[in-house]
Design a protein with these regions (language model features):
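Membrane-interface alpha helices of multi-pass inner-membrane proteins
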Residues: 174-189, 234-236, 241
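Aromatic- and kink-enriched transmembrane "portal" helix at the membrane-lumen/periplasm boundary
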Residues: 76-79, 83, 89-93, 127-151, ...
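Membrane-interface anchor segments at the N-terminal boundary of transmembrane helices
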Residues: 87-96, 145, 355-510
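Transmembrane signal-anchor helices characteristic of membrane glycosylation enzymes that use polyprenol
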Residues: 13-44, 131, 233-244, 513-517
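Transmembrane-helix motifs of polytopic, lipid-linked glycan transferases
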Residues: 92-117, 121, 150, 154, ...
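Start-transfer (signal-anchor) and selected internal transmembrane alpha helices
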Residues: 1-33, 222-226, 491-505, 560-567
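Juxtamembrane membrane-water interface segments immediately following transmembrane helices
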Residues: 41-46, 50-51, 234-387
Length: 567
């Protein structure tokens, strides 16, 4: 009891707080400085290699490079990030870790009003900073998920920071941060809209808090209108990116994969029902062989133009099932785009746009006329949602949450070496990224060799992973118990609205972790079929950590509230 009482009374002095934050941040960067890049130029043409090539093009003043079927195929903010790191001579892996540390600091600062003691803010920051998923092997790839979780945290930090301070006239900076996060998250990944439910609900909470202020109606409405600052910054980010695409390729779009005409064409093709009744697998076949044949027989001009490639065995290798010739959902859109490229429709962005517009109109007309057996109109590249997926998705989703909470598959090093020609493939990547590749192998094996010093750093990170794997589950359970226990205290009439907003924010983080896990579970069950993969779930880990830490550390009782100490 004596030690507990002393702990309650003790807190960091401002100087020692910042020194301690600097020390643990420097230690994290030091440990991760021993990590090495994992480069596979020939094995990831749609992922790592694409982003790297785009980054090189940006540094040459050529934006995303010469136009073809891949140029605007993905949301490519990560390529710009790589180019900026190159210009600043910052090693790729260190840059990613620094960005993640900054996002951890912003989320910690966001919750400062309910974490008035510096020691509690320090614990939250440290817990987020040493998240094992942030140093997992997938982060060693040259791919956008290296920074995606950090960008997501900026969104959560920005809107949470504003909601907890919306009665303060100087809180608009948090809305700007939220807008930057929203913009970069969406520009980084096509599924970046997943953060919007949290933002919209949080905006509603902010409006509720502002409505309860003792101010004139006009002043309340002015403050509520400030919420559009985030939307404005978000729109500015997207407009700037689309403007660059307009300048170089003549199309004002973020991507021609997520554009309306490609979604319409893909959706039209997935309307066809021929052969679907024979497919008993959960992995969807968007357009079966019978469906393709039906389009050929119906004399679909624009789809038949792709037949020489879609039905070619060599072309199908890597896209279709070698035994059945069926294109699964996770690869059909890439096969469709590549076949259109071979057919000459990707000479310019405008020609590609016209082709997919014509393809959508033609296929929809055939379906609507009854010439082809088809379902209702749709415009999307996402798999169809049907009742048969409910149980498999729930099963995979809840397993994914357990997978994340127990920090599975988060070793800080790759189990294999980089694959590529050292002189003309790997070396240029090392020079551009200022990060060495793990090319050395143990004698007589294909296993990577790491020096004793590297292994010492890895063992420290592995030990930290074991601590998280044991404690996070317990911390989450305890946090949930405390959150439900304090409901009468938080939600009584005279309690501060800041406490209510913080309580909702923590529950919202848990809800968003569940949402992300279920989203990825659906894609895994219906489209990919590659098994639970930590990279796609890496945005879940920091949300669980933050919810557990804030749920346990936050001051919920009104009489305990002290003036917040800002970071």
């Amino acid at each position: 009891m004596k030690y507990l009482s002393a702990w309650k009374r003790w807190d960091f002095k401002p100087k020692w707080f910042w020194i301690s934050v600097a020390v643990i941040t420097a230690l994290k960067l030091f440990l991760t400085s021993f990590q090495m890049g994992y480069y596979t130029p020939d094995l990831a043409p749609l992922d790592d290699t694409l982003m790297y090539n785009m980054a090189v093009s940006i540094t040459k003043g050529e934006w995303l490079g010469a136009y073809d079927w891949l140029t605007l195929s993905k949301h490519s903010f990560f390529a710009l990030w790589l180019a900026v790191l190159h210009w600043l001579h910052i090693p790729y892996l260190i840059g990613g870790q620094a960005l993640y540390a900054a996002s951890c600091a912003t989320l910690t600062g966001a919750f400062a009003p309910v974490l008035p003691e510096r020691k509690k803010k320090f614990i939250l920051y440290a817990a987020l900073l040493y998240n094992p998923a942030a140093t997992a092997a997938f982060t060693l790839r040259v791919y956008r998920d290296n920074i995606f979780p950090a960008l997501c945290l900026l969104v959560f930090a920005g809107i949470t920071g504003y909601v907890l301070r919306c009665t303060n006239k100087k809180a608009i900076g948090w809305l700007v941060l939220c807008g930057v996060g929203l913009g970069t998250v969406y520009l980084c990944r096509e599924d970046g809209i997943w953060v919007w439910p949290f933002v919209l609900v949080a905006a509603g909470v902010a409006i509720w808090r502002l409505a309860r202020m003792n101010e004139t109606r006009r002043k309340k409405l002015r403050r509520m209108a400030l919420l559009f600052a985030s939307v404005g910054v978000f729109a500015a980010c997207l407009s700037a990116w689309a403007g660059m695409n307009q300048l170089f390729y003549g199309r004002f779009v973020v991507s021609d994969f997520s554009s309306s005409e490609f979604n319409a064409a893909y959706g039209a093709l997935t309307r066809l029902e021929a052969g679907q009744e024979e497919d008993g697998d959960l992995i969807q076949i968007p357009l079966t062989q019978k469906g393709r044949q039906a389009l050929y027989e119906a004399k679909s001009k624009y789809f038949t133009a792709l037949k020489p490639w879609l039905e070619d065995a060599d072309f199908q290798n890597g896209y279709a099932n070698s035994e059945t010739g069926e294109y699964p959902a996770g690869s059909f859109y890439w096969a469709l785009r590549r076949a259109a490229w071979y057919a000459g429709y990707y000479e310019t962005a405008q020609k590609a746009q016209r082709y997919f517009t014509d393809l959508a109109q033609e296929v929809n007309a055939l379906c609507d006329s009854g010439a082809l057996e088809a379902g209702p109109r749709r415009s999307s590249t996402a798999p169809k949602i049907t009742p048969e997926y409910v149980l498999p998705v729930l099963k995979e989703g809840f397993y994914s949450l357990w997978f994340c909470a127990t920090m599975q598959d988060t070793a800080p090093y790759m189990g294999g070496i980089s694959v590529g020609r050292a002189e003309d493939q790997i070396q240029p990547m090392e020079e551009f990224l200022y990060t060495r590749a793990n090319l050395a192998a143990k004698a007589g094996t294909a296993e990577p060799y790491y020096s004793p010093v590297q292994m010492a750093a890895y063992y420290v990170l592995l030990f930290i992973r074991k601590i998280y794997a044991v404690l996070l589950i317990a911390a989450l359970a305890a946090a949930l118990c405390r959150l439900f226990y304090v409901i009468p205290t938080v939600w009584k009439d005279r309690a501060q609205t800041c406490q209510k907003a913080a309580w909702l924010a923590v529950m919202g983080l848990i809800g968003m972790a569940v949402l992300r896990a279920m989203m990825i579970a659906f894609v895994e069950v219906a489209s990919f079929g590659i098994g639970t993969y930590v990279m796609y779930l890496s945005s879940v880990h920091p949300l669980l950590i933050a919810a557990a830490a804030v749920g346990l550390l936050a001051v919920w009782k009104e009489e305990e509230n002290a003036p917040a100490v800002s970071l």
